[in-house]
Amino acid sequence: MPEAPKIAALEVSDESLAEKNKNKLQFIEDVTTNADDVQRRVLEEILSRNADVEYLKRHGLEGRTDRETFKHIMPVVTYEDIQPEINRIANGDKSQVLCSNPISEFLTSSGTSGGERKLMPTIEEELDRRSLLYSLLMPVMDQFVPGLDKGKGMYFLFIKSESKTPGGLPARPVLTSYYKSSHFKNRPYDPYTNYTSPNQTILCSDSYQSMYSQMLCGLCQHKEVLRVGAVFASGFIRAIKFLEKHWPELARDIRTGTLSSEITDSSVREAVGEILKPDPKLADFVESECRKTSWQGIITRLWPNTKYVDVIVTGTMSQYIPTLDYYSNGLPLVCTMYASSECYFGVNLRPLCKPSEVSYTLIPNMAYFEFLPVHRNSGVTSSISLPKALTEKEQQELVDLVDVKLGQEYELVVTTYAGLYRYRVGDVLSVAGFKNNAPQFSFICRKNVVLSIDSDKTDEVELQNAVKNAVTHLVPFDASLSEYTSYADTSSIPGHYVLFWELCLNGNTPIPPSVFEDCCLTIEESLNSVYRQGRVSDKSIGPLEIKMVESGTFDKLMDYAISLGASINQYKTPRCVKFAPIIELLNSRVVDSYFSPKCPKWSPGHKQWGSN
C-alpha cells in the first residue's frame, strides 16, 4: 500500500514533464514564426531602457528606438572600439556608460585583444536568458531520444580561474559564472539536469580533484547514465585519457568505498561520500574493461546505457571526431546549442544529425541580430580574414535576421541587453535552412583564427609576432628563419601546437638544442593569456613543438600546392596547414624536433591590473 502514492506522483510528474516539453516546443514555434516582430520588439526594448546611456547619447540616438534610425546612426564596432568604455567600467566607473542596468560582472572571452582575454559586460538578468536557452535543449532532444528523464547525464563540467577587476567586479568565463550562480546551484529538481557529478565536484577549483571525483561518481552510477558529455570535444577526450591513466586508483576507491587521500577538498569528500559505497563487483568490472588492450568503445562498455555523446564538435573541435568515434563505438555526437561570452544564440533542432550537418536556429528574443555578408577570396586559406574597420557602404550592407539568404556566409553582429551595440562577434556562419521564419546557421569558423586546441584561438598576426620574438635566439649563431608554417596536433591528448621551421644557416657554429627549446618557450610566452592558461592552469594544451625541416622543404610544399591548382603568382606559404597530405609531406622532411622545456608564465587577471 505505501507504494501507491509514489506511483500516482510519478504519473503526475510524467504528465507535467510532457506538458512542460510541449510548452517549450510551442515557444520555439512561436518565436521562429514571428521572428521579425520579436526582433523589432527586442531592439525597441534594449534601446528604450538604455535611452540615457552615455554611449548611445554620444552617438546621437536621442532616445529613438526604431531600426532604421539605429542602423543609420550607430556604428558597427569591434572590441577595440569599445575598449575605453569597458576599461572605465572595469576600473570602477558606476555611471551608465554602456547599460542602464548595473554591470554585475565581466565574462572573459576566449577571444583576445592585445594578448589578454576580452571582457564582455553582463547584467544579472542575462542569467534568465541563458537559463531559458538551456531549458529548450532537452524538450528538443526528447523528440528524438525519449526517456532521458529516467536516468542521469554524466557531464564533465569545470570552473576556471577568475579574477577581480580594479573596480571589484568578477571577471570569469561564462560557464564559470553560470555554474557559480544560484540559477545552477539552487536549480529545482529537474530530471534533465540530474547529473552524476554533485555540484561540489563541479565547483572544486582544483582541476585534478574535480576530474577525479566526477569520474568516480560517474563510474559508481554507471548503469544510470543515459548520456555523457562535456562542453567541448577536447574536454571529454581529456576525461577519457584521465580514466586511462587513473583507473587503478578509481577501481581501488570503488572496491573499498573509501575516497583517495589525494582528494582534500572537504565539500567534495562529503558529496562523494554520499555516492561512494564498497562495491567489489563494480571494481572488478572496471578493472577488467580498463585492462583490455583496446580502448575502442570504452564509453559503451563502461556506461552501457549511453545513448549519445553531448559535446561541441563544430568549428575547430571537428578535429576530435575520429577519436570520439573510436571511444564511443560510433554513438551519435550531439551539438545542442550555440553560445558565446557575448550572448547565448540558439539551439540545434536536429540534434542527431551528422556533425558536418549541424545547424543552429537562432532564438530571436536572445538579442538583436544583424548579419554582415562575407565575401571570401577563392584560394587556399586556413581562416577567413575579415576587415577590422568597415566602410560606410559595408555598414549599410548588414541585413536583419529574417532577410539572410540561403547558402550565403555572414559575420554575426549583436546588440545585447547588457550594453553591446552592433558588436561584431567574429563568428562566420552560413545559412543552412529555415525554421519557420528564423534562419538556421552552420558554424564555419572564427575569423582570423589559425590555431586552436581547446578554447584557445591564435591568429596569424599573433603567431607571426611570437615567431619574430623567438628567432632573436638564432642571431648569435648567424642563422635566420627562411620559412615556417604550423598546425594543431591533436593526435595525442592534450593536443599541442607544432611549428615547422626551415632555417638559413650562414655561420659554422652548431646551434645547441637548448637554443631551440628557448625558441619554443619564447613563442609560448608571446602567445595570448588564454593559450597560457591552457598550458599552466587547465592543462588542456601540451608543450609547443618546433620541427626543423630539410632545406628546400617549403619549395616542395609550393610545388605540391601548384600541382593541386594553386596559382604560382598568387601562392604564399600558408601559416597554418590542416590538409593531411601536406602535414605528411612536412613530417617526412623533419630532421630534428624540440619541445618547450617548461610552462610559460601566466596568472589570472589582466596584466594592466597588477596584483588585482
From Swiss-Prot:
Expressed in cotyledons, stipules, true leaves, hypocotyls, and all parts of the roots. Not detected in flowers. Pfam families: GH3, GH3_C, GH3_M. The keyword Ligase applies. InterPro entries: GH3, GH3_C, GH3_M. Induction: By auxin. Not regulated by light. One of its GO terms (cellular component) is cytoplasm. Optimum pH is 9.0. No activity at or below pH 7.5. The keyword Ligase applies. GO terms for biological process: auxin-activated signaling pathway; response to auxin; unidimensional cell growth. Its EC number is 6.3.2.-. GO terms for molecular function: indole-3-acetic acid amido synthetase activity. Signal peptide: none annotated. Keywords: Ligase. Catalyzes the synthesis of indole-3-acetic acid (IAA)-amino acid conjugates, providing a mechanism for the plant to cope with the presence of excess auxin. Strongly reactive with Glu, Gln, Trp, Asp, Ala, Leu, Phe, Gly, Tyr, Met, Ile and Val. Little or no product formation with His, Ser, Thr, Arg, Lys, or Cys. Also active on pyruvic and butyric acid analogs of IAA, PAA and the synthetic auxin naphthaleneacetic acid (NAA). The two chlorinated synthetic auxin herbicides 2,4-D and 3,6-dichloro-o-anisic acid (dicamba) cannot be used as substrates. Involved in auxin signal transduction. Belongs to the IAA-amido conjugating enzyme family. The gain-of-function mutant dfl1-D (T-DNA tagging) has a short hypocotyl under blue, red and far-red light, but not in darkness, shows an exaggerated dwarf phenotype in the adult plant caused by the inhibition of cell elongation in shoots, and inhibition of the lateral root growth without any reduction of primary root length. This is Indole-3-acetic acid-amido synthetase GH3.6. It comes from Arabidopsis thaliana (Mouse-ear cress).
